[in-house]
Design a protein with these regions (language model features):
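Aromatic/hydrophobic pocket-lining residues that form π-stacking "cages" and hydrophobic walls in ligand
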Residues: 54-55, 86
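A cross-family acyltransferase "interaction/gating" segment
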Residues: 27-30, 44, 77-156, 160
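Generic beta-sheet signal
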Residues: 63-69
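Short active-site segment of divalent metal-dependent hydrolases/proteases
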Residues: 73-74
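Conserved ATPase "switch" residues in P-loop NTPase domains
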Residues: 59
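C-terminal alpha-helix
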Residues: 163-171
Length: 175
């Protein structure tokens, strides 16, 4: 959701890779741009290659770069397959990857909340309003152990990282 970037940035500074549309969103786009977000045209293979090069350069400079390897938004109840393309940047930069799980929890029930979801026909305003008016909404960020890129192939590593993130999820387990 749109809230993922804000929560993860609050938990620790990082640059994000995000779909190009976000830079045109009111307020959130401006904040994402000022945070150094790398924008990607998701339907362009050439643009993915460009972003991988920028990510590699940022990682080699010691910057922290965050990606959403599912490549799309969902209701958050299940974990979608991870795309491997952007993981190549960590392999090329010889940079470890830190698996991170982000969940929105209804603190009253302890269950996963779908309040912040922004999918389908919903508008951004509807999602923001629902998030702001949901009582007891709590963001939980869980960190795994850093994983070295040494000897990794990006597709296999993407599947392993997905398993690591699934294990970090507190409300849904393997997702």
């Amino acid at each position: 959701s749109w809230l993922d970037i804000l929560v993860l940035h609050a938990a620790g500074f990082c640059r994000f890779v995000s779909k190009a549309d976000i830079k045109d969103w009111p307020v959130i786009g401006m904040m994402a741009t000022h945070a150094g977000t790398l924008y990607i045209a998701r339907d362009s293979r050439r643009d993915a290659l460009r972003v991988v090069h920028h990510m590699r350069d940022a990682l080699q400079r010691g910057e922290v770069v965050a990606v959403f390897p599912e490549g799309t938004t969902s209701d958050g109840l299940t974990l979608l397959p991870f795309h491997a393309n952007l993981i190549q940047a960590a392999i090329s930069a010889e940079s470890p990857v830190l698996p991170v799980a982000l969940e929105f929890i209804d603190s009253r029930s302890g269950q996963m909340s779908t309040a912040p979801m922004y999918i389908g026909d919903q508008t951004l305003i509807e999602s923001v309003w629902r998030t702001l008016t949901t009582p007891g909404l709590r963001a939980v960020v869980s960190y795994g152990e850093p994983q070295s890129p040494e000897g990794r192939e990006r597709r296999e590593w993407a599947a392993e990282l997905r398993e690591s993130v699934a294990a970090l999820r507190t409300t849904t387990g393997a997702g």
